[in-house]
């Protein structure tokens, strides 16, 4: 593992200058998309920086300079940075701890790729003073003797030195219920940018899992919100747009410092506290809790050899971190409050990963005063899981022997534990009031939601649907985007297969029976489900109780998924 650089300075004057400069430079997501082709933008999303380097090589546009420097991790002359950030300047960047001066040799090595892309060789401002002409070779000279009592002279610094970024800094745009937002978010540089393994206390930027949680978070106005395991603080920035008070916690002191920096840079008030899970907010309760906890199931043998990556490994045995979050959350939730989290869980070899995956999660939720919607969006066998997470932490930089040692040790741990698969998904909880809790919580488990990832309103609806009115006395309304597809054997009057499609919402496609199709088709908000079921029974010459038994569970699923509303 590598050693982390010091965290950015929380100097609000300098941070204010940086904010003014990035705004003035139009360093926004929209402008970045104008500077780069769709292909280069897509490559950046895959952590491939070379296409963007090719397209931005040699450009003096301030947004291009800042993109090369902070996102593509290319050295820049201090003068170029001062032109891009005229209020802060290169000296201010260095004072904030966002950049450092490097020597010509380090700069030349890092710039090899960009020069191969066609970028002109950028010289110091005064060539004659800083560059020895090739036609005038320097004569050898005798070393100068210095008095031992004399202080050593300060090392010479070039008038226009090269600088390199110490952090990733990039624009991030969001359209939320309260309007459009443009933020700038700092995080630690990744191994793709540095070519080095991650430090133990690495603070991750905005990755795919982060975006998933951001998309699925309920964005209703609340008085208070909590981000557990805040990392770079992006979840907390989003929460601040619709919560009167936001608290962000993290076990990592480094993550807390970077969250504080990002809050200051984006002029947002966030109460940042260091500590494990809910310990920093003991005795407090919130209307909304979000968490992308360090859930990767990591054995002690791997931690001992490679270190504990704080951003993904909470240090607990097996998947007990998820259990700790679920069991501890209700005490920190107001009645009616919501928890949303991403999670991994182990599935024993003795259980089917498609039909019995929820057993472990269900045991954790047993007896809690909550309703729960749990979705397993993917399932991996242990070998694929191990390979994915080793590569995530820079496995491509490992020596073959080190990679194989870590892989076999990790896989052997899963075998000893009897783990047959690892489920990956999300959990949404709603805290019950005293009367609801007396009768116990409702829980729904869904496997591999196809279509779209759920958005906040989809999650809110799914949780609310667990407390839907008595089905048979309820008049349901079919969503306007629901369509039906029927498959027939040639010459047959009855369909062999009926598939119901959802255009919006979760975008699901669900096989249904003829009876379910008939009920959905007749659900226009006028007749109750009981009345429609009786009509279907009469038309098909089937007992009404048999029709009810056939349609009850599928209708509850269709309600939860948004095909039907009440």
What does each model-found stretch correspond to?
Residues 251-252, 317-376:
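Conserved Class I SAM-dependent methyltransferase catalytic core
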Residues 181-217, 495-497, 509-514:
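Class I S-adenosylmethionine
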Residues 77-78, 83-120, 128-202:
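Non-catalytic substrate-recognition/targeting regions of SAM-dependent transferases
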Residues 382-466:
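Flexible, glycine-/basic-rich loop-and-beta segments that form/coincide
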Residues 62-114, 153-168, 214, 231, ...:
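Long, charge-rich, low-complexity alpha-helical segments
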Residues 2-65, 159-165, 170, 193, ...:
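Acidic, low-complexity/disordered tracts enriched in E/D and polar residues
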Residues 199, 207-291, 298:
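Conserved SAM/SAH cofactor-binding pocket of Class I
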Residues 253, 293-324:
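Mobile active-site "lid"/loop adjacent to the S-adenosyl-L-methionine
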